[in-house]
């Protein structure tokens, strides 16, 4: 297992955010989590990524207990909500800076993904000139460019055109075959049907069932 959640709960101002969630994620699979807005999907990803503390329970990533605010033992690729890039810097400069912060930056995978998503013609432009779709593709590249073994994607198809969505889904299937684990959150159940090995429903902070 690359991820294990054991009876994880979280409340904010008395409101249930996550309620007694237990979940195990295997390597080399794509998991989908769907539900209406406000059901807790994004908060679950934030907890796994270590971006949010929990009130009770435990989260293990690659066998290591997740501690809020502490860098994990493995690199996690994350697209949660809007990624804040430096608007006055080029897309490529943003990727380079992020890569260097995380460790030695091998730009070969980033360049491959830029070419794959047809971003070559604007990657050297300032990010503040990007459309929402261009910004979303840049966010996806930063989450995948270091061949992270665990990838958490919150509504990754937002603002993407049909061709880019198809490319993304094909790429995620490729990553699965390479043994990487992907968690995709969407409020659209049908978007996950073809892509995922297993799907879960969230409602009012609770995780329900699973479908293979």
Locate the predicted segments by residue.
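Conserved ABC transporter NBD signature motif
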Residues: 57-72
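Catalytic Walker B motif of ABC-type/P-loop ATPase nucleotide-binding domains
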Residues: 151-155
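The feature captures the beta-strand-to-loop junction immediately N-terminal to the Walker
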Residues: 34-36
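Conserved ABC ATPase "signature" region
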Residues: 96, 107-122
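Helix-to-loop junction immediately C-terminal to a conserved catalytic motif
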Residues: 49
